[in-house]
C-alpha cells in the first residue's frame, strides 16, 4: 500500500443521512465496499447535527472552512470548532494526514449522481475527469460565488463533493444508497489507478461552470411570491434558453429566464434544494463547457499521489 | 351566512411548509380561494416550529391533543400548551368556536392528495364521503393504533387531515400547492352544500382501513438494517400480496410481506415518510373496504352543521 490516505466524509450536513448510513453498514461489513487497496479514513462530518437530525447546529459546516475564520481566535459556532478539529486530525498536516477528501452529500434536487468541484485546482480537475470518464456523471464547477465559500474539501490539497438526489432530508432511500455506493467505488478505483500509474485520461472534461445563483421572486417581507415553475422543477441538468419559465405565482405570473441570446443554452442545477432557500438560492445557472484535459492537471495529481 | 365556522389549520408540523405558504398567499389575496360563503378561521398550528423549520419544538403537536393530557395540570411541552391554546380559542366551546377542523399536511410519501380520518366518527365519514365523491381521492382510516393518538382534529366534533405528497420537508412545490388548493376548495364546497342542504351523498365510501404499522428491520443498536425495497418505494396505495418484498439490505437480504392468503390484497400507505422513522414506522398496512354510506353519518353531520 502507498502512504496515501483518502478521507471519506459523510454527514457534513446532519440531515443528509444516506451516506452516514452507508458508512455504518460498511463498518459492520468490510466487504461491502472494495477499497481498491487504498488507505481510507471515514468520518462523520457533523455528528452532533446528525444525531439531532438537522443540517447544522449553529452554522453550515460546509461553509465553515474559510482559512481566515479557522485562523481567527474569535470562533464561537460549534461548526467552526468542528472544522478546526477535522483539519487538525485529517488535514494534510494533521495527526492522521489525508491527501484527498471526498465529501458525500444528498440533495432534494434531481441532481442524479454528480460531482462538485470548487474553483479550478488542477488536481481536482484531473481526478474528476477520470471519474467522469468512468461513470459519465456531470460535474458542477462552483466558482466566483463570494457569498458561498469555506467548503470542507478546500482544506485538503485535492477534494470534491459527491451529490446524489433527489431525496428528502432525513430519509433513507435504497436507490440513493446504491448511487452513492457506485460513485464511491468509482472514486476509489480511479484514485487507485493514479497511485498505481494505470490511468487513462480522457481528452476532455465536461464541466457545468457556475454563472450565478437565482433567488425566488420575493414579496416585501421576504417570503417567496412565486414558486419554481413546473416545467423546470426536477429538470436539473436540462438546458434552457432565454425566455424559459423559471417561476410561477398562484395568479399565473411568470418569471422568465432573461439571459443570453436566443440560441444560447444555460443549465440549471440544484433546482429547489430545500436547504438553499435560507441562502436565497432557488437554483444555480451554469454553462456547459468542454475543456481539454491539461498536462498540469495530470502532473499535479500525480505529484500529490506519487510523492 | 350560517353561524357555522370551519377551522383550517396549516403548519401543525413546522417543516410542512406548503399549506402555510398557501394560507399566507390567501391572506394577501382574498380571491385566491373561494370560501363558498362559509365562515372560515385559518391558523398556523405550530408557528414556533414553522419559524424554526422543524417538525416540532418538544413533541409532535399532532399527538398532543389527548384529552387526559390536556386536562392534566402537569404539562411541560411547548406543544401541550399550544394544543390547549388552540382548543380554548377555536374548539367547539372556545372563544371563537369552530365545528369542523381541517388540518393540512404534506408528506415525503407518494400519497398524492388524500384524506385521513381517525376512528369512525359518523360526521367525519359523512363529510369525507362527499369529498371523495367529488374528487375521487383515497381515504386512510386510522384506528386501533394505541401508540399513535392525540390527533388535533379529534378535539373538534368533526375533522380530518388532508395529506399531500410526495414533497421533501421544508420545500415549496408548485404541484403540492395546487393539489392542496384543489382539495381545500372541494372541502369548502362540500361543507357549503351540507349547510345549504344541497348534498348528494354517494352510496358507498371507499376506505383504506389501518391494520398495522410496519417498522424497518433493525440491528441490535436500533439502526435500520434494511431499506424500503425499490418495488414498493413510492408505490403508496398500490395493493400488494403475501410474499411481496418490503425491505432489502445491502447484502440483498429481502424482508417479505407475510400476511394473509395468496390472493388477499393489502395496501401500504405512508411508505418511507421521513418523520415516521422516529416513530418506528416504515409504512402502514391497510385494507381497502367499501362501506355503505349510513343514514346516521348523514344525520350527525347535518345536525352539526344545521343546528
Curated annotation (Swiss-Prot), chains A, B:
One of its GO terms (molecular function) is zinc ion binding. It comes from the Bacteria. Pfam families: AstE_AspA_cat, AstE_AspA_hybrid. GO terms for cellular component: cytosol. Zn(2+) binds at residues 13, 16, 105. InterPro entries: AspA/AstE_fam, Aspartoacylase, AstE_AspA_cat, Aste_AspA_hybrid_dom. This is Probable aspartoacylase. It comes from Prochlorococcus marinus (strain SARG / CCMP1375 / SS120). The lineage of its organism: Bacteria, Bacillati, Cyanobacteriota, Cyanophyceae, Synechococcales.
Amino acid at each position: 500500500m502507498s502512504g496515501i490516505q483518502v478521507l471519506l466524509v459523510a454527514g457534513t450536513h446532519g440531515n443528509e443521512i444516506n451516506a452516514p448510513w452507508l458508512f455504518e453498514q460498511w463498518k459492520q461489513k468490510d466487504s461491502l465496499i472494495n477499497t481498491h487497496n487504498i488507505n481510507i479514513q471515514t468520518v462523520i462530518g457533523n455528528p452532533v447535527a446528525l444525531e439531532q437530525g438537522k443540517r447544522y447546529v449553529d452554522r453550515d459546516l460546509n461553509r465553515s472552512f474559510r482559512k481566515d475564520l479557522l485562523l481567527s481566535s474569535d470562533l464561537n459556532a460549534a461548526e467552526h470548532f468542528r472544522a478546526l478539529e477535522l483539519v487538525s486530525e485529517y488535514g494534510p498536516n494533521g495527526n492522521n494526514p489525508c491527501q484527498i477528501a471526498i465529501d458525500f452529500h444528498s440533495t432534494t434536487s434531481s441532481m442524479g449522481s454528480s460531482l462538485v468541484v470548487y474553483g479550478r485546482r488542477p488536481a481536482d480537475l484531473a481526478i474528476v475527469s477520470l471519474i467522469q470518464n468512468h461513470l459519465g456523471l456531470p460535474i458542477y464547477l462552483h466558482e466566483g460565488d463570494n457569498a458561498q465559500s469555506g467548503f470542507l474539501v478546500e482544506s485538503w490539497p485535492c477534494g470534491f463533493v459527491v451529490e446524489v438526489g433527489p431525496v428528502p432530508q432525513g430519509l433513507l432511500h435504497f436507490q440513493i444508497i446504491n448511487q452513492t455506493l457506485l460513485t464511491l467505488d468509482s472514486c476509489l478505483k480511479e484514485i487507485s489507478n493514479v497511485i498505481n500509474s494505470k490511468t487513462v485520461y480522457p481528452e476532455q472534461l465536461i464541466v457545468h461552470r457556475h454563472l450565478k445563483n437565482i433567488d425566488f421572486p420575493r414579496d416585501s417581507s421576504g417570503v417567496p411570491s412565486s414558486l419554481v415553475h413546473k416545467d423546470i422543477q426536477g429538470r436539473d441538468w436540462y438546458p434552457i434558453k432565454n425566455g424559459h419559465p423559471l417561476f410561477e405565482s398562484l395568479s399565473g405570473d411568470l418569471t422568465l429566464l432573461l439571459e443570453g441570446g436566443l440560441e444560447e443554452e444555460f443549465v440549471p442545477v440544484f433546482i429547489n434544494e430545500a436547504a438553499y432557500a435560507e441562502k436565497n438560492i432557488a437554483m444555480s445557472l451554469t454553462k456547459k463547457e468542454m475543456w481539454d484535459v491539461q498536462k498540469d492537471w495530470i502532473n499535479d495529481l500525480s505529484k500529490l499521489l506519487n510523492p
